[in-house]
Amino acid sequence: AFATTLDAAAHGKTSAGPVGNRMYFNSDTMVHRRATYAVVIRMRSKKTVAARCINGACLKAQHVADGAIHVYPTDSAAARFLSMPAVWDWHSLPGITAATDSPFFACDPKISEALGYQWPLRMPGGSFVGGASDGSVGAAAMQFGHGGGLLPQTGLVLSRSHFLFDDTIVVLGAGLSSKTP
């Protein structure tokens, strides 16, 4: 079904699909769909993991689960978004807060071997992710901090909340601090 949807998008034949809002608690993901766009917020807590790099794919995706907000059109313009990852600045994905000088360590062979390929990357203790939805609108929250386990010692912490309404998305952040500039 997904391959069919991608193929349809590549040829300008998309459908609006279901409209609504849903929080997927097991994957710390909120999906907000409307007739002309879809929003996906990917978050990470102690129960979920960072993106994995396998067989040379996702080599710079370690921040994708750090609150990234992806907005996709659901009309024929959706096809142009299929090639976007090729030109992304992986430290500046919409919605994430990351130290811009942190290395993409997760898939570095030397570091991975030294760590014994210790996957998955989990958030340090104390992180929280949650959300609520009535099926039409929703709210999601994430409290996270970088600095323990396999993550760089940036000391980055942040609380963020997302409110998704019919035609408005509000994102609020608080408590941002870091050991690095």
Annotate each language-model stretch with its function.
Residues 1-181:
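Extended polysaccharide-engagement surfaces of secreted carbohydrate-active enzymes
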